A protein has these predicted regions:
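Active-site acidic carboxylates
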Residues: 1-77, 166
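Active-site-adjacent betaalpha module
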Residues: 56-168
Length: 168
């Protein structure tokens, strides 16, 4: 399970990157984390940090920390990334090892989540995207991103948390 950029900056009302109230998103994501953990999945969190930044996305910023509400445990992997793709110059490939399947959720759907999906697809992963555990700034962008990915990468599975739990 790869959880992309569930960071505090998205929940800061003073931030240009504020997504609004994402409590329900976090609750659904915690259900996903708990379910995957019970199934023995490796849990990987990514966090976006801009290398030369001195603002909200800098290493020292509270905004780049993972959300406290997430069900994190000591054995979970946290990968700091510096570009849109979680694969780019990170240890994600190494952490995924010989896995053939990847479950994806995260923020922003149309940016880092999409980039992860595209790069995982090009690496021949079997991909399941948990739609209701992804978020971006507006519904139209969210829907277009999923529609476009479906149209261009037919093998990707798109489910909500309830569907995923039932099918697994």
């Amino acid at each position: 399970l790869v959880l992309v950029d569930f960071q505090k900056e998205w929940t800061n009302p003073e931030s240009d990157d504020f997504l609004g109230d994402i409590k329900q998103l976090v609750q659904r994501t915690n259900k996903l984390i708990d379910f995957c953990r019970k199934k023995g999945c490796k849990i990987i969190f990514t966090r976006h940090v801009e290398k030369d930044s001195v603002d909200a996305w800098s290493e020292k910023s509270e905004g780049t920390r993972l959300l406290d509400e997430l069900h994190k445990e000591k054995q979970d992997v946290i990968i700091t990334k510096h570009k849109i793709s979680p694969f780019y110059q990170s240890k994600l490939d190494k952490e995924l090892g010989d896995s053939e399947k990847i479950i994806v959720a995260g923020i922003l759907t149309n940016m880092c989540v999409r980039s992860l999906i595209q790069d995982a697809y090009d690496r021949d992963f079997e991909i399941t995207v948990i739609k209701d555990c992804c978020a971006t700034y507006d519904k139209k962008t969210q829907e277009f991103t999923f529609k476009d990915l479906k149209a261009t990468r037919e093998k990707i599975e798109f489910l909500n948390v309830k569907e995923f739990v039932k099918s697994t």
